[in-house]
Amino acid sequence: TLDKVYLHIYPNAFCDKKSIPFEESEMERAYPNGFNEGYIDIKNVLNNNNKMKYEIIGDKNDILEVKLDKLLKEGESIKIDLKYNVKLPNCLGRFGYGENTVNVTNWFPIACVYDDKGWNLKSYEAVGDPFYSDTSNFEVRLLAPSKYKLATTGEIVEQKTDTEKTLYTIDAKLVRDFAFILSDKFTISKTKYKDVLINTYNLNENMSQEAVDVAKSSIDIFSNLFGDYPYNTYSVVASDFFIGGMEYPMLVMIDESLYNNENKFLLEYVIAHETAHQWWYSVVGNYEISEPWLDEALTEYSTVLYFEQKYGKETGDK
């Protein structure tokens, strides 16, 4: 029985230098133009058009506590409507924008997990991937300037464009999060693995074919090892992102600086690693801070298996 529900509002972790999820040594790379804030501004929390009482709590003001008018019993549900504005920082992390891409991830109020230990209310930490969420179905309508191309969790089921804006209707089933990336510089390459459409979003032609090949090989190898990739699309997205790679359902971000011959091996490693997270994080969920062996350790082992399968055991052992 619940008298309150909690949601993560991760953008508030970016509102000042004391709370941002970066180590001090990362600040210059995260904010090449100097620190500027990001946040989420909650305008209203409603149930059946009635205002609900709420409070913003947590070490970084990144937890939304919503008080229920009546107790919510096991098996019951409640509809909560949220109105809010989000400001993205000029930041080259998961959440923010750079010269090439707009990275919109961990951006909306997402329900905290209630498990056998109770509510999980940990703030956005600087170390590791501090995310923990249940699977949900998303139906999203996204309006964006027409000059941008869109990489997204889910399938675009409808697209209406006029001279200035494009309205996307997106459907994403059984995913733990919803992320999207926009750019007016993307070139898109496509291929298929069985019934899976694989998209690679590139910011230049360097290594674009290699990115396609690695994405397809990864889906192939991991599907044979761990069971079929469970979605219809998969997108590998070159991004203004200094941390290497980051996984989201049906979509991974890859540091655009890796797309060159000098970093060819590292690019393959990062794409394969992030693809493995589609099984170890996306399919098999876990609390990534307290149980990292369930996502990072298994993903790292899976990456070794990828190189063994593709190039032989000697390469995998390296």
How would you name each of these model-derived features?
Residues 114-115, 129-272, 300-304, 313:
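Hydrophobic helix-coil surface modules that form long, contiguous segments used
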Residues 62-66, 78, 166:
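Short strand-edge motifs at loop-to-beta-strand transitions and within beta-strands
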